[in-house]
Amino acid sequence: APVCMIAPISSWAAAVSSTAEGLDTGISGIQLFIKAIPYNLYSLLTFVFIIALSFMQFDYGPMRTYERKAQETGDLSALENAEDEAVNPKGKVIDLLLPVLVLIAVCTTGMIYVGGFFGVDAWGGTDCAGDFIGAFGNTDAFMGLPWGGIIALLFTVIYLVARRVITFKDAMACIPKGFNAMISPILILTLAVSLKATITSLGASIYVHDLMEGAAATLYSMLPAVIFVVACILAFASGTSWGTFGILIPIVTAIFPASSELLIIGISACCAGAVMGDHCSPISDTSIMASAGAQCDHLEHVATQIPYVLTVAGVCVVGFIVAGFVQNVYITWAVSFALMLCVLFVIRSMERRKAA
């Protein structure tokens, strides 16, 4: 989830941009998403956390218990009823990597094509010809991504069948399973867009704007941190980050002026909080798929994740407070990354004292 949240070529980008499209932001939905990436502290700090933890070679919380158990006894706590999947001797690493690379390349090409990079865009204009960044900002993710997905799917089927990794019959049997897996996200996105329309029709944006108009500048600067915490709680309780986008993004755009840097920071805080809550929620589809893929007990997976997630989230709160006041991405990064490393050093010191 943290990776998808900062990837412009993903269904998550489409979810955020579609929710923000048509709101009073002054830019397109995909442009808003791209501008929000540098301030998405949860995703960025998660990478820092993982890399630092790997180099420092320690664990804490329930994860430490399970890691020690695995090292000493070899017990990986695999599910007892997990099915033993037959290993295909014909499969190679390239069979996984090549379709993914084709998907990325074709989706990128599809999005800049719709945005007008190669000439006339989907809207009939020619302003973005040869302008990669401009074409990305002018694109419609819901037009570009499906074409990329369809072409990549066709390539994958032809490639794997030609290599005789799977039969054509097996390939066709996988397609309905893929459609079934996407029913829930599509329904969530549809309901989120409907909720956005309802909020707009009720005039919630006008109410929130009037409510915040007389607020002190200090309160405005603290709002990104508040938005992050609210998004965390909402996503954790509901188990869906996409639904959180639909609820909070229209409210965030009503709070901050379209030309304000705080609007970008607020959207980033919303996205970061939604991913954080979704990341550790026991009813989240991403958590369920992660535990199922690792063949471990679902509640044990959630229990081992929560201390790590809360550590990153705590640093994010401080980071968004700093971002709200300084409104400078480089200062925000410096403070957040330094604090993340300091927190890990302190935790490692505490764990060593416990072990002594």
Segments and roles (model prediction):
Residues 1-63, 234-246, 267-293, 304, ...:
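Alpha-helical transmembrane segments and, especially, the helix-loop junctions at the ends
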Residues 3-5, 90-110, 151, 180-196, ...:
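Selective recognition of specific alpha-helical transmembrane segments in multi-pass small-molecule
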Residues 18-26, 59, 108-121, 161-168, ...:
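Transmembrane helix-loop junctions in multi-pass membrane proteins
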Residues 31-33, 46-138, 150-174, 297-306, ...:
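Long, contiguous bundles of hydrophobic transmembrane helices that form the permeation core
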Residues 39-41, 92-95, 145-146, 179-185, ...:
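Membrane-interfacial loop-to-helix junctions in multi-pass transporters
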Residues 51, 104, 108, 157-158, ...:
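Alpha-helical transmembrane segments of multipass membrane proteins
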Residues 156-233:
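Helix-loop-helix junctions that connect adjacent transmembrane helices in secondary transporters/permeases
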Residues 186-192, 217-259, 263-264, 270-278:
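Hydrophobic alpha-helical transmembrane segments of multi-pass integral membrane proteins
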